[in-house]
């Protein structure tokens, strides 16, 4: 008889605990009732990227000294740096620089450790394409500055977004 009574007591405690959990989750749901949705009509409205957003990498060919620090600090050895040694001036001459954004993890190590600041992160994040070989950017494509979202008159930027206010 005693095991049956303790079983009913445990059942009662479990019922109270379950009701408390349901009540807590219901209160969380009610706290979100007055909030506005954060839906953005993507092609026509865009949220301005944060200040430290890690988008496409911009490369300045004239500043690069072909030191290959970017390759050494990259966790996947991604940047391809081709250079030749100029014997008369005893310096490296950069021939080609490319990054495959299909493989890049956008960690920003190459930008952070570059001694000449020839690499920088842009706000461009629309890199989608149908052919993955188009994601391999050479020094010409990397040197192209992205069109700013703010300057594009066809896109309405979302400045009063709750996501921006929280950051």
Swiss-Prot record:
Chief location bin: plastid
Summary of subunit composition and partner proteins: NDH is composed of at least 16 different subunits, 5 of which are encoded in the nucleus.
Cellular compartment(s): Plastid, Chloroplast thylakoid membrane
Documented EC number(s): 7.1.1.-
Cofactor list: [4Fe-4S] cluster
Name of this protein: NAD(P)H-quinone oxidoreductase subunit I, chloroplastic
PANTHER family: NAD(P)H-QUINONE OXIDOREDUCTASE SUBUNIT I, CHLOROPLASTIC
Taxonomic path: Eukaryota, Viridiplantae, Streptophyta, Embryophyta, Tracheophyta
Cofactor note as given: Binds 2 [4Fe-4S] clusters per subunit.
Source organism of the structure: Morus indica (Mulberry)
Family listed: Belongs to the complex I 23 kDa subunit family.
Membrane topology recorded in Swiss-Prot or TrEMBL: Peripheral membrane protein
